[in-house]
Amino acid sequence: MTNIRKSHPLLKIINNSFIDLPAPSNISSWWNFGSLLGICLALQILTGIFLAMHYTSDTATAFNSVTHICRDVNYGWVLRYLHANGASMFFICLYLHVGRGLYYGSYMYKETWNMGVILLFAVMATAFMGYVLPWGQMSFWGATVITNLLSAIPYIGTDLVEWIWGGFSVDKATLT
């Protein structure tokens, strides 16, 4: 009698991907951070979609929408905390994934490493935009501090900061 995980069409795919995965026996736990990144990213997307359903860009009602999510939405507080802590876990896994690549010398594969660096910058830019764009529900101080780092660029830094802010200071919601 054959095992159902090897004969059923859907279970066979899962079996070949996870259980009978052709991987070397000396693989360490450092190699699972890519999978954890995928899980964290899926969690971020799902919780972000559900939180966006209650989004309001008006600075006067932004705090009320957050309290509405936490108090009135079923398990809204769980969504909010999963989204916040999921972002932290995502970046922890990301940095450990990069650290594993450094430790095992993956930087020797130049094309692969350069693509990873591009993806790292894209992820950081996306996270920054996700933090800065909904002005009404984020920290003006955080946006000011993060974007002020650009002022350290010689000659064009201050002009670049003013261009990103659209003026001399961060103000009002940008998403409507």
Curated annotation (Swiss-Prot):
The chain crosses the membrane at residues 33-53, 77-98, 113-133. It comes from the Eukaryota. Heme 1 (or BL or b562) is low-potential and absorbs at about 562 nm, and heme 2 (or BH or b566) is high-potential and absorbs at about 566 nm. This is Cytochrome b. Heme b b562 binds at H83. Keywords: Electron transport, Heme, Iron, Membrane, Metal-binding, Mitochondrion, Mitochondrion inner membrane, Respiratory chain, Transmembrane, Transmembrane helix, Transport, Ubiquinone. CDD domains: Cytochrome_b_N. Gene3D superfamilies: Cytochrome Bc1 Complex, Chain C (1.20.810.10). It is a multi-pass membrane protein. GO terms for biological process: mitochondrial electron transport, ubiquinol to cytochrome c. One of its GO terms (molecular function) is metal ion binding. Binds 2 heme b groups non-covalently. PROSITE patterns: CYTB_NTER. It comes from Lasionycteris noctivagans (Silver-haired bat).
